[in-house]
Amino acid sequence: MRLNQLRRLLSRLLNKPEQTSEEDTGMNYLVAGLGNIGAEYASTRHNMGFMVLDAWAQASNTVFKTERYGDIAEVSFKGRKFYLLKPSTYMNLSGNAVRYWMDKLKLPLENLIVVCDDLNLPFGTIRMRKNGSDGGHNGLKDIQARLETTQWARIRVGIGNNFARGGQVDYVIGDLSAEEKAAVPGICDRVIEGIRNFSTIGPDRAMNLLNVKPQNGEKGV
């Protein structure tokens, strides 16, 4: 007898409502937005991952709770549950938080999505990939090391590279310009839609929809 059949039989015998096992459905996802904790980093380019998750939680009228290795919020969409993780480990140790929560939630790698900034993309450009290299991003590099694989999805949000030689660090932890800040809500909306599509229509179709050039004026800079 299959496990689900046995559950239904026991539910009837015990006169209890039948429950669906979340682990069996595969409808749970971990969305890790990368950034650095602290008010001084809140509006910096390197915190684009945090900004996306904050926007999603706010739109869903939910709040983050401080848990081990990070802040966690839960949002739902069409029967899917998304655990939004903002690691408290600082960027370079993001893998500790992602590995812990993947194990705790017992999720397969295909149900992990990481959102981060990318210097190699123009500001506002968004790219989703099912797998790939770290691209020089220290947060992705640590996640790759902790998970011992590159077979997990990531969404890169372009922050541009408008800095002089040797100025990379100051640029990524520098505040967004006024024009960039004005564009952030639209960027967050597109990323959130992309993640929802990832869970409903699959990664390939989600990538085709998300990985398009922004329309005129969409980047805001």
Residue map of PLM features:
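Nucleotide and nucleotide-moiety/phosphate-recognizing core
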Residues: R2-N131, K141-I155, N162-G167, G174, ...
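Hydrophobic alpha-helical segments within soluble ligand-binding/sensing domains
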Residues: G136-G139
